[in-house]
A protein has these predicted regions:
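Helix-terminus/linker motif at the lipid-water interface of multi-pass membrane proteins
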Residues: 28, 32-50, 120-127, 183-190, ...
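Short runs within selected transmembrane alpha-helices of multi-pass transporters and secretion channels
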Residues: 71, 140-158, 166-174, 195-208, ...
Length: 448
């Protein structure tokens, strides 16, 4: 057995822990990427500039989710072929997806750059921060192909059980991003433009190195393969499109929520933006475990070891419970200090109140996010995308309906009060579908 095959040979809890920890650390440094802009801009430029950067978050997440959803489609198939040791098909799907998504990323980047001002205006971005928000967004879209391709390559690495290489690259690029942020924002005084440019350069370096290392990594699998295969592309898109729709629709929903928050003013937006960054940091633990479960399930399905799938799911739930407890303790103890990292001395009482209330509410219910992510990860690994999509749409509908109906009338708190209910509904729908879809001996024979 190759050492790369530990996801189908080691004990499930051990395998998932070894696999997920570099992904969690990698996701942490991915958020450091994003947080560096916010913290440095907030400390050295001011809360208005922080609000400008934060106002872009919901929109940029839509485009990031297209990349993540596309990676899911390719990653599930790469994992399955890797588990079955069908390296010819594995390399074919890798090549096909990289060519297809490279073209897509360039088109999306051009679209985003050209329509930045229109999109931010439609989101009701406050007039006093609109120009800075548009500037940040346009620089972001110039570098979007790098971000897109890095996310695809990172998924490829994890699909073959290699999560340490993306971690190393993220640490390097995150450190580079922070130093360039400090230089361009604090020393050169380039403000929001400097923060966006620093991130663009760091993403570009990370994407190029990822491609070169992955190309070298693939050389160990000696086999013939096709550069582009339409049938494999169609198979990949059957999985990728529901995932893209799910993730993009959720992010579009968050854009609508952003539009609900914006009329409350710049300071409320600054507090909301600060906690959105914190939510992203804590949620990465649960997202990473869900992302680790998918290739674990897919590899074991491809290797005809379906009895390990349920054990892996239980192991993921255990890890999620531990991380939810940790998140609660940290937030309950340090929520004010965490808010001050973003808001600094310039933050008003309103900004701190919004940030603190939102953060503490999330801390009570992160366990719901954890169990829904683990369940969704199993569904993705099995290629069962319809209930996965439905569950996320219900989650979004609950969050949007409460925010749109109640927040304008009764206050900004209703933007986040419905979040745990959406997570719980998502889990219940996903789990009901999963109970009907556990692989059986017949599944093993069909896969083989």
């Amino acid at each position: 057995m190759s050492k790369d095959e530990y996801l189908i040979t080691d004990k499930p809890l051990k395998a998932l822990t070894i696999f997920a920890m570099p992904m969690i650390l990698g996701s942490f440094f991915q958020q450091v990427y994003n947080m560096a802009d916010s913290i440095i801009v907030g400390q050295f430029v001011g809360s208005s500039a922080l609000a400008a950067v934060g106002a872009c978050a919901a929109l940029t997440n839509v485009f990031i989710c297209v990349a993540l959803g596309a990676g899911v489609g390719a990653g599930v198939l790469v994992s399955r072929y890797f588990g079955a040791r069908n390296y010819s098909k594995m390399k074919t799907i890798v090549s096909t997806s990289l060519i297809s998504f490279c073209i897509l990323s360039i088109l999306l980047g051009a679209f985003g750059f050209g329509f930045s001002r229109l999109m931010m205006s439609l989101l009701q971005t406050p007039a006093d921060i609109l120009d800075e928000a548009v500037l940040y967004l346009q620089v972001y879209f110039v570098g979007f192909p790098f971000l897109f391709m890095y996310n695809i390559l990172s998924t490829m690495f994890t699909s073959i059980g290699e999560s340490k290489i993306p971690l190393g690259l993220l640490i390097f690029s995150s450190v580079l991003n922070i130093f360039m942020d400090l230089w361009m924002v604090a020393d050169l005084g380039l403000g929001v433009f400097g923060a966006a440019l620093a991130t663009l350069i760091a993403q570009g370096v990370s994407a190029v190195f990822s491609f070169l290392i992955f190309l070298y990594r693939m050389r160990r699998y000696k086999c013939r393969y096709r550069w582009f295969d339409r049938q494999e592309l169609q198979l990949m898109l059957r999985i990728a499109i529901p995932s893209v729709l799910q993730q993009s629709t959720v992010s579009i929903g968050m854009m609508i929520v952003q539009a609900v928050v914006n009329p409350f003013g710049t300071q409320a937006l600054a507090g909301y933006a600060a906690t959105m960054r914190v939510e992203n940091v804590f949620s990465l633990m649960f997202v990473s475990i869900g992302n680790a479960v998918s290739p674990y399930v897919s590899q074991n399905l491809g290797a005809n070891k379906t009895s390990r799938i349920k054990k892996g799911y239980r192991a993921a739930l255990l890890l999620d419970t531990c991380f939810a407890a940790l998140a609660f303790i940290v937030i309950e103890t340090l929520h004010t200090q965490i808010s001050s990292l973003f808001l600094g001395k310039d933050g008003t009482a309103l900004a701190y109140q919004v940030s603190g209330d939102y953060m503490r509410w999330l801390g009570y219910f992160f366990i719901f996010m954890g169990i829904k992510m683990a369940t969704a990860g199993v569904l993705r690994g099995l290629g069962i995308m319809r209930p996965f999509l439905i569950a996320n749409m219900v989650n979004l509908a609950i969050r949007l309906s409460v925010a749109l109906i109640f927040a304008p009338r009764f206050g900004i708190a209703f933007v986040w009060l419905a979040v745990p209910a959406g997570w719980l509904a998502n889990f219940l729908i996903s789990y009901a579908a999963l109970r009907k879809s556990w692989p059986t001996d017949e599944t093993e024979r069909a896969v083989s």
